[in-house]
Amino acid sequence: MVKKSKGRQKIEMVKMKNESNLQVTFSKRRSGLFKKASELCTLCGAEVAIVVFSPGRKVFSFGHPNVDSVIDRFINNNPLPPHQHNNMQLRETRRNSIVQDLNNHLTQVLSQLETEKKKYDELKKIREKTKALGNWWEDPVEELALSQLEGFKGNLENLKKVVTVEASRFFQANVPNFYVGSSSNNAAFGIDDGSHINPDMDLFSQRRMMDINAFNYNQNQIHPNHALPPFGNNAYGINEGFVPEYNVNFRPEYNPNQNQIQNQNQVQIQIQNQSFKRENISEYEHHHGYPPQSRSDYY
Amino acid sequence: MTRKKVKLAYISNDSSRKATFKKRKKGLMKKVHELSTLCGITACAIIYSPYDTNPEVWPSNSGVQRVVSEFRTLPEMDQHKKMVDQEGFLKQRIAKATETLRRQRKDSRELEMTEVMFQCLIGNMEMFHLNIVDLNDLGYMIEQYLKDVNRRIEILRNSGTEIGESSSVAVAASEGNIPMPNLVATTAPTTTIYEVGSSSSFAAVANFVNPIDLQQFRHPAAQHVGLNEQPQNLNLNLNQNYNQNQEWFMEMMNHPEQMRYQTEQMGYQFMDDNHHNHIHHQPQEHQHQIHDESSNALDAANSSSIIPVTSSSITNKTWFH
């Protein structure tokens, strides 16, 4: 049976001849083997030691509680596990707790990864649907002609200016003199629309209303950080756990009298978010600073 | 085939735990056997059960003795170099999965921003409620695309195109969705080209740095050492990713004069459009083109109505990351 890919097909149980394939197979299967061993320890409380010499004669080993203790027990033909002392009991209990938290965290990350992959596939479908409209500027850049590229380039530069001006609105407090330029922003808006009609005051008011909606939207994002209880003691969990519950937030009703107050809140929200991001990174670094073999607390 | 995912926790039911142990122990032994056979290597496994004082071993007692002896004769450093316990192994897996998740999120974000960029190009910017993070990412995306377009333009200009072909393609372009007046109006002045060039230089440098980091991370480093090194790579990638997007905008913010100048340019271009329209001799044809654009925009809006929900959801996640 000839198949194009190597997914889900049986292979001969003999030594592989291709050297690079052999190396890749060893790496993948060793990892899977250790994974199965780890699961067995977690589910059934077994003690395991696995020693593997790679094709390059390097040695890989996995053990629970650790390789040396299990090997010692085997060599000495000792039927009793060395857990008779109280200290050993306490250490075992704490290790189990740490392993349980690590397992929970791993399950959570893998679940999020699954969700993110589905999202990526959805976005791909949307892109396919948009491309089907037949707009030439969405073709790969290599397939466009020179004049098309130059026109496209001009439009992209215009769009970049619009994005920059829109972004500067969020920092009006930092660049107050730029607020005067909002009338020119309407001109830019007109150009991008492709129409040459001067926008009237109604259009200007609509844009201001959209900006206010954006403020409300941001305002919703910041509150859950403080309102939600901590997600366990896991530093990762605090960051990851916020995400699923975030979607239940509601948008407060728009009140024109609070326009200025919300503008001020906007600036504060930005500052808080930036500091929050830095804290996230700091926590991330701090966690990974632990050496892997350390017996110290995980938290 | 299991019908549902097994929860990774100690099985409290005694009989269920015993059955699971029996099945999984057998599977584990089988996997050691397959690995040893396929790669022609030396391996052994020792499994102690809570219910039995005698261990299960592979391949045999004497086989394990031989492998263990070989293992123990290695220098101490070599023995522990790639040794992991369950705690260390789980941490490695978490780090690996976290990096994969981060990369997947980045890919999703780029795909989303590409869609938003093309929608904005045909005048649908209002349907997305873009916040500062979205605008920052969108600006970065536009800059990347501009870099590709500029590179392609240089290639075509260097190869040289016949005048006839240019003329015919120009006609084709005018038949497209962007009418000729816009093409004329959007020709960028020299100063703007220079600015875009400088930005592209920065982006090019950033791109040059990133592949090295990814290669370093993907290199099959030593297991023990890898866990020490991976966090640094992860942090470096995170910081650089953050810095790239942030610096794009900060560069613009640090030059408010340029922003004011660009705003004036936009106004000037707008007046230029008016001037061009005044000379135009076929207003009806122009009206027809505008109508075509509106129809196309409406079609795009209908087909993309799902985007706001997706965008909001992704934005929420990106916000906390």
Swiss-Prot record, chain A:
Tissue: Expressed in the endosperm but not in the embryo. Detected in young siliques, roots, leaves, stems, young flowers and anthers.
Keyword Transcription set for record: yes
Disulfide cross-links: none
A molecular function GO annotation: protein dimerization activity
Keyword Transcription among record annotations: yes
Domain of life assignment: Eukaryota
Signal peptide residue numbers: none
Cellular compartment(s): Nucleus
Coiled coil: 99-133
PROSITE patterns for the chain: MADS_BOX_2
Domain MADS-box: 6-66
Cellular-component GO terms for this entry: nucleus
Gene Ontology BP annotations: endosperm development; positive regulation of transcription by RNA polymerase II; regulation of auxin polar transport
Primary subcellular site in the record, as a coarse category: nucleus
Pfam families noted in UniProt: SRF-TF (PF00319)
Note: Plants lacking AGL62 show a premature endosperm cellularization and a seed-lethal phenotype.
Primary role: Probable transcription factor. Required for suppression of cellularization and promotion of nuclear proliferation during early endosperm development. The FERTILIZATION-INDEPENDENT SEED (FIS) polycomb complex is required for suppression of ALG62 expression at the end of the syncytial phase of endosperm development.
Full protein name: Agamous-like MADS-box protein AGL62
Annotated organism of origin: Arabidopsis thaliana (Mouse-ear cress)
Gene (name only): AGL62
Swiss-Prot record, chain B:
PROSITE patterns membership: MADS_BOX_2
Organs and tissues of expression: Expressed in the central cell of the female gametophyte and in early endosperm. Also detected in ovaries, young siliques, roots, leaves, stems, young flowers and anthers.
UniProt-listed SMART domains: MADS
InterPro entries associated with the record: MADS-box/MEF2_TF (IPR050142), SRF-like_MADS-box (IPR033897), TF_MADSbox (IPR002100), TF_MADSbox_sf (IPR036879)
Coiled coil: 89-114
Gene3D superfamilies found in the cross-reference section: Transcription factor, MADS-box
Alphabetical list of CDD domains matching this protein: MADS_SRF_like (cd00266)
Cited SUPFAM superfamilies: SRF-like
Principal subcellular localization: nucleus
Gene Ontology BP term (one): positive regulation of transcription by RNA polymerase II
Location within or outside the cell: Nucleus
Domain MADS-box, first and last residues per copy: 1-61
GO CC field: nucleus; polar nucleus
GO molecular function: cis-regulatory region sequence-specific DNA binding; DNA-binding transcription factor activity; DNA-binding transcription factor activity, RNA polymerase II-specific; protein dimerization activity; transcription cis-regulatory region binding
Alphabetically ordered keywords of this record: Coiled coil, DNA-binding, Nucleus, Transcription, Transcription regulation
Source organism, top-level taxon: Eukaryota
Other remarks in the entry: Plants lacking AGL80 (mutant fem111) have defects in central cell and endosperm development.
Subunit structure of this chain's protein: Interacts with AGL61 and AGL62. Forms a heterodimer with AGL61. Interacts with MEE14/CBP1.
Role according to the record: Probable transcription factor. Controls central cell differentiation during female gametophyte development. Required for the expression of DEMETER and DD46, but not for the expression of FIS2. Probable transcription factor that may function in the maintenance of the proper function of the central cell in pollen tube attraction.
Identification of the protein by name: Agamous-like MADS-box protein AGL80
Organism for this UniProt entry: Arabidopsis thaliana (Mouse-ear cress)
